[in-house]
Each structure stands twice: as C-alpha cells, then as structure tokens.
C-alpha cells in the first residue's frame, strides 16, 4: 500500500486519505455481516452503467458510500490509490491538476474505476495502453467469503488478479485499486479523416496502430465513427502543450457532428476526455437534446450521460417508449446496446454484415491492443476475456433499438450479433443483454478458470454466478 497521503505530504483537496478510506471499508464489512446468510450479496448502489435487467432483491446491500473517492495521488511515482466506487469524473479531477491522467479513461463520467476493471472499459488510448485493468498494480477485493485480500500480479492472489477483469462482481468487489498514471499536456489536437469505404478505413487504422503515427505526425488517441457504408471517419488525437483556441462541445455545438464538419480541431485535455459524455455519444438525440430549440433551453448541467440515464430509468419503469410506438401503430422494439471486439482484419467484414442486417447508425470504432509486455504472463493473460497479446482488435459500439420482426424469437437481433461475433473470432462485453447457452458462455468467458476462482473466493456462493448475472438476469 502506498504511503502517499499517510507520510510525507499533505493531502490535496480531492484526496481523502487512507484513514477516511479505512472508515469506509469498516462500514462495508459491517454491511456484509448484516446481509442474511441465505441472501445473495449485492451492492447497495442506486446508479449503474449496465444495460441488462436484473432481478430485484429485498435483502440489504453492501454499503459502499465510503468508497467513492481518490485516496491519494503520488505525482512522482505517477500512481494513484483509488476507492473502488470512485467515478472517473472524480478521478480525472484529482489527477489533472498534477498533469496526470489514468492510462485509459472510459467515455462516460459516472463509470467507476472498480466497474471498469471488473466489467471492462475502453477509450481512444487503448491502442497503446490496453484496457483499464492492465494499468492496475494491486487491488483490494472484498471476496464472497467476506474477507478483504490484496491481489497483485505476483502474490498468492495472482490468479484472482488475472480473473477479476470481466467478473462483474461475481468474485468480489474492489475496495481499493492502485493504478498507473501518465503525463498529459493541456491540449489535444485532432484530425478527422474521411473514408468512403470501410475497408480502406480498416487498412489505415491498422497502419496507424502499428506505426503510432500518420502522415509524419504522432498519434496518441485513435477512434472512429461510421455514419454509413460510404461515410466513415477516423479521429486522430495528438497531445500538445501549444496554446491556442479550443472548441467547446458542452453548449450548442455537438461533438460527433463536428467530425463531419471539420478536418481539424483542438480541445482541452479535460474536454477531450469527456467529449462523448455531453451527448452520450449521439444517444441524446433520443430525448430531443440535439434539436436546437430544445438544446437552447436544456440546462447545461443536465447535458451529461448521468442525466440521460435517469430518463432511461423512467422509460424502463413506465414503458414510455413502447407506449408511444404502440400509439403510432409501430411494432415493439428490441434494444440493441452492445460493445463487441473483433480482430482488426475482420472489422470491415463485421461492419458490412451489420450495416446490411441491423438498421443502426452511427457506429463507434475503437482499436485496442493488450499492453506489451503484459502485466501478467500467458498466451491469454486475462482468462475471463481472453484477448490475445500482440493482436489488434477493434471495439465496435452500437446503442439503439430495432423493430421486432413478426414471429421472431426474443432477442433475435442480439442473438444474430452474438453468432456473427463468434464467427469472426471476436468477443462481446457483458454490460448488456446476452443470450448464450451455458456451454458456449463457459467457452467464451473463462470456464474452468472461473469455476476454480469461484470455489476459492466465494465457496458458499454468496455472490451471483457470472452466467446467472450476465445471461439469466438474476
């Protein structure tokens, strides 16, 4: 455990310190002991970035209210000790004053560090920095047995360290994570490259990932947007400390539309990290927030993903969207909210299929490679999400709904996507609806390795099983 915040330095205003953190841990343990022995252990957490339904429980949950902050930042070592339920919004606010940031900052402000590690996260730095769990140095985990253990890549809990990513709280909950940070300058310069063919985009993206540059200029961030089969873009970001004018996409202007309108742009590093949050990528259009007249009166503090989540929750509770569709005489709609990864050489294949079969646009693209060298050894070092080191993948995100076809089985579009992803040697994140059968799920998400960890760290099955949670919605 880092001594930063304990010895040698006064805490910065956004750092809570280890003493306050221990109070939160003690409260967590007390809440664990208060949960009936025959009840599943869950978080008493009102917010979530998951898009899959789950069964309700009347049992009390884990009190994580004291585990929401940054414990301490060590600017010299470029590390931070962070509570598991700390949001990236708060984490970035604590590290940017030092000129530092997490190696990967997922796109939405209310994603927590613990959530990104146990459930995966990604962003435009992932082609050089991998996934959030790869910059974790050590992690304190409350296991299903009610014990807090510290897992590192080399200690007696190394297998838990490897198996924790993509376990979604079924092996335990993180209470503290020690993570690496990287230096960041104040600004990011952007280039938007247009492509009329997704195969040309695939080739260019692959070359940029390999060279980490384009047209003689360094590339620090890389993602893309597909608007149609004949209009797609890669956005190349370069860190810079050069002063100059910057754009603001928290007001009337909309970031994803700027990609179609400008070839170059500049943002502060803060606004770049949160460029997708203001309009929840493009999903704010579902609430009318992109209509100029509505946007003009929409309170600026409520142009953020966390508020749109509240609107989604209201819709789920009262079936507002389904009611409106029925009044229009339209069929019900199937939610298709997914992030998948395919090898980069299969990107165009998947996009061709998707644009032909699933009427959703735009589509987000984000290349990634596991870090080299990997923090843990093995041909597939993270067994619950077994991507291969040395291989480039592309995360493809799409978040909307499609009309239900007459006579189609439940989840027909999502099932078709799962089949196509598997056929292309890809993987699918588990934050949303999944329809795999038990055998296929085990083959894709850890199988025997997961079962062994479950027996060790949750021997009484106090926590839900991953298949029960991700597919059976328990």
Mark where each language-model region is.
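Noncatalytic alpha-helical scaffold of FAD-dependent oxidoreductases
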Residues: 1-474
């Amino acid at each position: 455990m880092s001594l930063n915040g304990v010895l040698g330095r006064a805490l910065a205003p956004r750092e809570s310190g280890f003493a306050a953190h221990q109070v939160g841990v003690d409260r967590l343990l007390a809440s664990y002991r208060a949960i009936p022995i025959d009840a599943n252990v869950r978080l008493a957490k009102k917010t979530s970035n998951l898009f899959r339904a789950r069964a309700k429980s009347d049992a009390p949950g884990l009190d994580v209210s004291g585990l929401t902050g940054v414990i301490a930042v060590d600017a010299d070592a470029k590390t931070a000790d962070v509570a598991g339920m700390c949001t990236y919004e708060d984490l970035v606010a604590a590290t940017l004053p030092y000129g530092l940031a997490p190696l990967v900052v997922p796109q939405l402000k209310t994603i927590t560090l613990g959530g990104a590690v146990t459930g995966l996260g990604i962003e435009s730095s992932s082609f050089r920095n991998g996934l959030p769990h790869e910059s974790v140095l050590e992690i304190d985990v409350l296991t299903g047995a009610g014990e807090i253990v510290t897992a590192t890549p080399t200690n007696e809990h190394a297998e838990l360290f490897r198996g924790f990513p993509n376990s979604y709280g079924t092996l335990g909950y993180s209470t503290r994570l020690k993570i690496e940070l990287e230096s960041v300058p104040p600004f990011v310069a952007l280039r938007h490259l247009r492509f009329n063919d997704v195969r040309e985009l695939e080739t260019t993206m692959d070359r940029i990932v390999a060279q980490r540059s384009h047209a003689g200029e360094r590339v620090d961030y890389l993602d893309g947007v597909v608007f149609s089969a004949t209009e797609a873009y890669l956005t190349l970001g370069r860190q810079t400390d050069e002063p100059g004018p910057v754009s603001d996409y928290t007001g009337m202007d909309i970031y994803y539309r700027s990609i179609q309108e400008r070839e170059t742009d500049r943002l502060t590093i803060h606004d770049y990290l949160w460029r997708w949050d203001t309009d929840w990528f493009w999903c704010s259009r579902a609430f009318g927030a992109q209509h100029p007249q509505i946007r003009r009166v929409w309170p600026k503090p409520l142009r953020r993903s966390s508020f749109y989540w509240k609107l989604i929750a209201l819709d789920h509770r009262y079936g507002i969207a389904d009611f409106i569709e029925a009044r229009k005489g339209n069929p019900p709609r199937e939610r298709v909210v997914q992030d998948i990864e395919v090898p980069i050489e299969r990107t165009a294949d998947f996009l061709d299929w998707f644009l032909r079969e699933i009427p959703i646009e735009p589509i987000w693209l984000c290349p990634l490679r596991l870090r080299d060298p990997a923090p843990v050894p093995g041909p597939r070092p993270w067994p619950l999400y077994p991507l291969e080191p040395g291989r480039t993948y592309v995360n493809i995100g799409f978040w909307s709904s499609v009309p239900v076809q007459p006579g189609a089985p439940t989840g027909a579009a999502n099932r078709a996507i799962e089949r196509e992803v598997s056929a292309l040697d890809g993987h699918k994140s588990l934050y949303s609806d999944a329809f795999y059968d038990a055998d296929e799920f085990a083959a894709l998400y850890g199988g025997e390795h997961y079962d062994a960890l479950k027996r060790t760290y949750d021997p009484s099955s106090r926590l839900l099983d991953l298949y029960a949670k991700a597919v059976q919605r328990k």
